[in-house]
Amino acid sequence: MLVSKELNAAYWSLRVAFGLGPLIAGLDKFTNILVNWEKYLSPMAQHTLPISPTNFMHIVGVVEIIVGLAILFGATRVFGYIAMIWLWCIAANLISTGTYYDIAVRDILLGLSAYALARVTEARESVVFVEHGEEYRRAA
């Protein structure tokens, strides 16, 4: 399979988005500059957790930072799938709040996009690149 410039552009767009997005959101779990993240935690989760919502959000932040960095720095395929599952878990939490359905839908769609990133990465890992009319096979 040959990789076109268009497919490569889609891959890099998704990789940067799913690298920087979780990284920024993860860092913000410690500052709450973008939003107070605890408000998105369902009452059921708050009562079930053995730690405070603040501490839980700090753990979430660390996980998101790891996911973002892993996607940016080479473990894109595996962490694309992890991002998909993570986003769907966030959506399930949001739905269980009885509010924030719009954000839940967004996260479901972002999860599908993370799946696309993982699949495009798999395709790229076994392809021939074409640059200036020359074919180059990716090293195995």
What name fits each language-model region?
Residues 1-35, 50-62, 66, 72-140:
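Extended, low-polarity transmembrane helix blocks
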Residues 38-52:
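Perimembrane loop-to-helix junctions flanking transmembrane segments
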